[in-house]
Amino acid sequence: ASDQERAGKIDTIAAAVLLDAEGRVADVMLDEVEISVTGDSTGKVTMPTDDRTKRQKGDDYPLAAVSSLKKGWAEQADAFGNYLTGKTPDEVKKLATDDDGKSKDADLLSTCTIAVDGYRDAVVRACENAKAVGSARGGRAVLGVSVRNDTKELTADDDHDVRLYVLDDVDG
């Protein structure tokens, strides 16, 4: 690749949490969107055509084939959510990870080998933004993620700079 060719990646994590009356995690739902962006020497920027989240991709996201656990992304993300159940937001925040973002907890590693540092941080933020909704005991957290990419190709300015914006709607 020449010095004029550029590549970038945008990772966006979504977390929904349900807290019990004591403020402990009762349920977690996670998802993530990975978007890779490339730019060539003419300034043409190409966006991906597959806008699905990791959960939406299911078996099309081939983690199970390379995982020592032989589990896909959704299974491991759900295992992480189950691990967090019963913990306070402060306990979640203190979850130790290694330099690769993976948990240092052997029990969690037996069911989830993906990097969890970003998911941990998203769950903490979701807990901080949580509002009482009067859920029944045994209620589940539900998460809907929609990605819309109206521009598959962009052209950079004369300096070959492109500005991409990620908009989130945390507060609805």
Model-derived segments and their meaning:
Residues 2-143, 147-172:
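Active-site- and interface-proximal helix/loop "cap" or "latch" segments in soluble metabolic
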